[in-house]
Structure formats: structure tokens, C-alpha cells
Amino acid sequence: MNKFLGYIFTPIHYLFFGFFVCLFHPIQWLCFKLGGQEAHKKSVDLLNFFLVNTYYLLGSSISFKNLYPLPENRPIIFISNHQSLYDIPPLIWFLRKYHAKFISKIELTKGIPSVSFNLKYGGGANIDRKDSKQAVAEILKLAERMKANNWSTVIFPEGTRSRDGKLKPFAIGGVATILKKAPNALIVPIVIRNSWKFVQFGAFPLSFGERMSWEILEPFETEDKSMEEIMSISEEAIGRAL
């Protein structure tokens, strides 16, 4: 039934999703040119509010849970599992007051309405996976911006999306690089549940009626912890919560 209804409602979802990303491309441009980065960020937040709401057109339920008061006056590294591209709009919207940035493939900075503009000018890191020196340099620049502005970054240490929802081993690289420049960053694990089911049939049809959730897990400090311990604590916490 999820697949059958998906055939009916997926075109409606894509129509509205596409409308909003096209609408907000010139809005982002105007906000950035006239109001600078802060105005641009507000336009991106609003875009992702609308994108998240297009999920409801497929009968989805979306929940975000955070029982922990997170600081806004220091950098945060959100460490999350990754199940689909649909993970990202809710993260941008629900974490908006923490100025969450992302590490993205440089190829995405061209040709995608709204998305490419935000990746270019939103303050994240755009890396060439074939050029490790460029990738490290970009992440270090991001870490410097985090430290200077008390921004946060969302890291997907699995390195790729999980097609079946099962957790893949965590890699150290991105988190270790950020901590070199922002050693005072707080580590905050996030568990994402069931967004993989949304795309279990591929891009078409999307699955109807899935219950997706994003939950903040217990934060912890990096002091007196090795990188292996930091990643192990995060991986185990997310694994238990899945």
C-alpha cells in the first residue's frame, strides 16, 4: 500500500518541492546581496521549513526530539547517522538556531536551484573527494568559521547513506580535522530513524506514510578523550537509539 499510494502522491510532493527550491533561488540571492549572510541564512531556514512540510504530502509523520539544553555560545559538532537526502532539510530547520553547516561534495555547488547557491555562500565546506589536500583545507576553514562565529556542523561519519537503515562503521577524519581548529566544540550525537524507508523504492515512487524522526542524544565533552573514544561513544549511542 505504501508503494501504491506513493505512485499517486509522489508527483504532488515533487511539484511542491521543486516549486520551493526554484522560488527561493532568487530570494536567497536578494537576501545575500542586500542583507548579507544573516539575511541569507534566514531565507535558507524558511526554504527548509517549506521543504520539510512537503514530506506531509506523502502522508509522512515527522518528529524532532531534544531533551538537552544546547549552548548557543560555542561550536557544536553534531554527529549523525545518514539514511537519505531527506535527512538534511529537517536538520537545517530544526537546528537553525545553532547555524548548522554541512560538508558537501563540490559537484553540488553547480546546477541545483537554491541548493547550489546555499552551498557556495552558506559557510559550509565544499570538498573534492579526489583531492585530499583540498578537502582537508576546506574543512579547516569551516572549523575556523565555527570557532569565530560559534556555528555548528553536522557530520555524517558513515561516509555514505545507509540504504537499509543499518548503521555503518564511523570514520574519524572529518571530526578530527574540525577539532584541530575548534577544540572546544561540544559533541552532540543525533539519531535519524526511518528516512531510508522514504526512499526504499528509489526516487519514484517515494514511500507513503512513513514515520520519520530526528532525536538529539546526550551531548558530551571531548576533553581527555581520544578520537577513537569520541567516535566510539557517538557510534554506540546512535546504534542503541536506532
Tell what function each PLM region has.
Residues 114-116, 154, 163-228:
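A cross-family acyltransferase "interaction/gating" segment
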Residues 75-77, 150-156, 186:
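Residue-level preference for the first positions of well-ordered beta-strands
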Residues 64, 125-128, 222:
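Short acidic-hydrophobic, aromatic-tinged amphipathic segments that line or gate anion-handling sites
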Residues 1-63, 117-118:
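A transmembrane-helix-recognition feature enriched in membrane-embedded lipid enzymes
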Residues 58-65, 136, 197:
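Short gly/ser/thr-rich secondary-structure transition/capping motifs
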Residues 21, 25-29, 33, 40-43, ...:
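Catalytic core of membrane glycerolipid acyltransferases/transacylases, capturing the structured
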Residues 224-242:
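A cross-taxonomic marker for long C-terminal extensions/tails that follow the last structured domain
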Residues 135, 142-143, 158-163:
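Soluble extracytoplasmic domains of inner/organellar membrane proteins
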